[in-house]
UniProtKB/Swiss-Prot annotation:
The keyword Zinc-finger does not apply. Residues 6-152 form the MGS-like domain. It is an enzyme of class 4 (lyase). The active site is at residue 71. It holds the Pfam family MGS. Keywords: Lyase. The gene is mgsA. This is Methylglyoxal synthase.
Amino acid sequence: MEMTTRTLPSRKRIALVAHDHRKQALLEWVSSNKPQLSEHQLYATGTTGNLIHSATGIPVHCMLSGPMGGDQQVGALIAEGKIDMLVFFWDPLNAVPHDPDVKALLRLATVWNIPVANNRATADFLISSPMFATEMRIAIPDYQRYLNERLI
């Protein structure tokens, strides 16, 4: 597939997602990075977003709960270019009923080439990067070209 680019803005739109057994770890990470995260737009699946807002006071755009379609809503925003970074603390030791949605979310984040953190160490690397609060160009699939080729 041909590629094009898009610019991630300096004020990022960050999706925050966590499985039940990882919510506390994500809350701790958000709390310890509140000053940096407050400068960006936060999105989250339902339960996670409400917990983050209650614990930190940071505004969060809440989707549905993950099992009710929230993971797919976040994935759709990624595909539309409306999410610039994903922090997803998923539980590698417990299966969840919506595992296919989780795989689809991670696949879309990879297809659309956005930064993804699956654990605290990676999230710390991303938030401490000089690129975190600056514009950054990324390569993405050229969907319009792909569509045009398929319609010929």
